[in-house]
Design a protein with these regions (language model features):
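Bacterial carbohydrate/catabolite-sensing allosteric modules
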Residues: 1-140
Length: 140
């Protein structure tokens, strides 16, 4: 996975014990996030705002606060983060750019004949997300 490569590039070996897996529902994330409390982690990256909100719900239930006790960064930057305080620092994918790239590829493939489409290699297109800094990270 990309995050594992990024960790290794910075001299950090990924630790599977620190990976928590959850469905993309707040209640599932609430249950899965209990593993965070068993670790010495002080920061969490959640793969969606819903997962981050489940984590926030658990932390608040345990009288822990963001960013005082844990820093939280999520991926989505959806409006869901307005349901909780503090607002989540988030990675935002440009959905317009993503849709344009998908349509461009689809139209290019539709213009090919059937045999060419079957032989076509997968396409990698890198879209640069942006970090939307809000209030859920404690600066060290």
């Amino acid at each position: 996975a990309g995050y594992e490569r990024a960790l290794r590039e910075h001299g950090i070996e990924p630790d599977p014990e620190l990976e928590l897996h959850s469905a993309y529902y707040i209640d599932d994330a609430f249950e899965s996030s209990k593993g965070v409390l068993k670790s010495d982690a002080t920061a969490v990256f959640a793969s969606s705002d819903n997962i981050a909100l489940g984590l926030l719900k658990l932390l608040y239930a345990e009288d822990l606060r963001v960013p005082r006790d844990y820093s939280v960064v999520s991926y989505d930057n959806s409006a869901a983060d307005t349901l909780f305080e503090p607002a989540l620092t988030s990675i935002e994918q440009n959905s317009h750019e993503l849709a344009a790239a998908a349509l461009e590829l689809m139209f290019a493939r539709l213009e090919e004949d059937a045999e060419s489409r079957e032989r076509a290699a997968s396409v990698t297109k890198i879209l640069r997300p942006k970090v939307v800094v809000k209030d859920s990270v404690r600066w060290l």
